[in-house]
Regions:
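Short acidic/polar inter-strand loop motif in beta-rich domains
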Residues: 99-101, 167-178, 193, 300, ...
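Contiguous beta-strand segments within globular domains
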Residues: 33, 38-98, 220-234, 347-363
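Low-complexity, Pro/Ser/Thr- and charge-rich linker/hinge segments at domain boundaries
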Residues: 22-34, 190-223, 436-460
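Aromatic-rich carbohydrate-binding modules that target alpha-glucans
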Residues: 115-143, 257-263, 268, 359-410, ...
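Bacterial Sec-dependent N-terminal signal peptides
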Residues: 1-22
Length: 467
């Protein structure tokens, strides 16, 4: 019986019709893709689909992957699927980055303590799916191992980190006997292939952050936006060089493509407190509450699911056509764009390997005119906030509606509709669903300060707030 490790890196990315490199690449030019890393495309025959999730451990899959350097060590959990029958020999590496997510000048031994063998995903960290219509292998790994008496994984420094998962080129094929726990090895001729990379942050609480979300007082932003105000109280930490060494990041709903960074304080109080309370650059569009649905039970369709059936041996889920939410704000409960994998059809069994996949059809009634040149996408945490061919909608002229069919794993999902130009230079998240100052959003604040003694950007403060 395989032992499954728990960790809180909840990863879900879109299920691909063809394989592609999965890595974090964001639109903010200040946050460049990590340097000195070469990616090679993954052949279609090797990997056909993904489910990726990342967050703190202890089952808190909805939280941002942020953990403290000292104190309560939550650890991390990495969980993802590869849609195939065979178990692969996978490894990971962890890279320390600066405030701009560029590789820092530190060597590995300076920022992490770990044994070489702990960088592997062995057979115990992989589980083939249980009698699902779409076969897959679920990979789950904890850092450190949950319940371990001796920590096998220790962060030595705070700051930004990137975790890369790569293929060693070894496949473990299951024997014909389904009850057999033995595996045979087949070595595949291939270079190291980086499958994806994800961001996380290790924090220190060296300063106190007091923050709030307010309605902007500027007329042009009052009805559709939200503003962050903040104080950084040093409590003895030397912030005297804040003008060049301090770096502040505001993030909306756990998205690294929705950030405001580089904000400077408006003034400094007598005790050294940095005050950020009148900055027009700290304004986010409020957006709207997310659309949501669940199909955790494949035998019962619950609104807004209209129909659940099977086609060519696979489950199909038809969602009720979405209304245009742009007209007025309506308060609804959501997960701020996130998702949860849930399987009510197999109680008591590990959901990571029991939940099935289904082709989910989205429909958006929309009267398109000659001026509509932008493409429309189904967008959310389920596909890592990416605009890809897999979540791009097609327009049905006869029915006057946008349509998309996306392969998803059983669970509860949030999503929205986004418009984008072909070159992605224009991205509009509010034209279809609207934007309102009342919308409930979650904001996270990261405060970095350059450490000259060790030559790296420390994360000296972290705060999560909601409006």
């Amino acid at each position: 019986m395989r032992v499954f490790l728990s960790i809180a890196f909840t990863l879900l990315s879109s299920i691909c019709g063809y394989s592609q490199i999965m890595y974090d690449q964001y639109v903010n030019p200040g946050y460049a893709k990590i340097k000195s890393v070469r990616f090679r495309p993954v052949e279609k025959t090797r990997i056909s689909a993904w489910l990726i999730a990342i967050g703190p451990a202890k089952g808190d899959s909805l939280s941002t992957p942020v953990i403290p350097l000292v104190g309560e060590n939550k650890g991390l959990e990495l969980d993802f699927d590869i849609l195939e029958d065979d178990i692969r020999s996978l490894s990971f590496r962890i890279i320390h980055c600066d405030r701009y997510w560029r590789k820092s000048n530190l060597v590995e031994s300076e920022y992490i303590k770990i044994k070489d063998e702990d960088f592997l995903f062995d057979g115990d960290a992989a589980e083939p799916s249980y009698s699902t219509t779409v076969p897959y292998v679920n990979y789950n790994r904890a850092f450190p191992v949950s319940g371990a008496q001796v920590p096998n994984f220790t962060f030595l420094l705070s700051g930004n980190y990137i975790l890369q998962v790569y293929d060693n080129g070894v496949i473990y094929n299951r024997e014909n006997d389904e009850d057999s726990e033995e595996f045979s090895e087949e070595y595949v001729e291939s270079d190291e292939i980086i499958l994806f990379q994800k961001r996380f942050v290790v924090t220190e609480q060296l300063v106190e952050i007091q923050a709030d979300v307010i309605r902007p007082n500027l007329v042009q932003y009052m009805d559709d936006s939200q503003q962050i105000t903040m104080k950084i109280i040093p409590h003895g930490f030397d912030l005297s060089t804040f003008d060049k060494d301090l770096f502040v990041v505001y993030q909306q709903n756990g998205r690294w493509d929705k950030i405001i960074s580089g904000i400077k304080p408006n003034h400094v109080s007598g005790d050294g407190t940095l005050v950020f309370n009148d900055n027009r650059n700290a304004i986010f569009q409020g957006g709207n509450e997310f659309h949501n649905f669940n199909f955790k039970n494949l035998r019962i369709a619950t609104a807004p699911v209209d129909f659940i059936g099977k086609k060519d041996g696979k489950y199909t889920v038809l969602l009720h056509p979405d209304n245009d939410w742009h007209a007025a704000y309506t308060s609804t409960t959501d997960l701020n764009g996130k998702f949860l994998i849930q399987d009510d059809n197999n109680p008591g069994i590990y959901e990571g390997a029991s939940a099935d996949y289904a082709e989910v059809k989205f429909t958006l009634p929309y009267h398109r005119n000659l001026y509509d040149t932008l493409d429309v996408y189904v967008f959310g945490g389920f596909n890592n906030w990416k605009l890809t061919d897999e979540n791009k909608m097609t327009y049905n002229e006869e029915k006057q509606q946008y349509e998309a069919t996306i392969l998803l794993k059983q669970g509860y999902y949030n999503y929205k509709y986004v418009k984008a130009s072909a070159d992605f230079k224009t991205i509009d998240e509010t034209d279809i669903d609207g934007s309102f100052y009342q919308t409930e959003n979650e904001y996270e604040i990261f405060v970095y300060f350059y450490d000259y003694a060790q030559g790296y950007d420390r994360c000296i403060g972290y705060k999560k707030i909601k409006n």
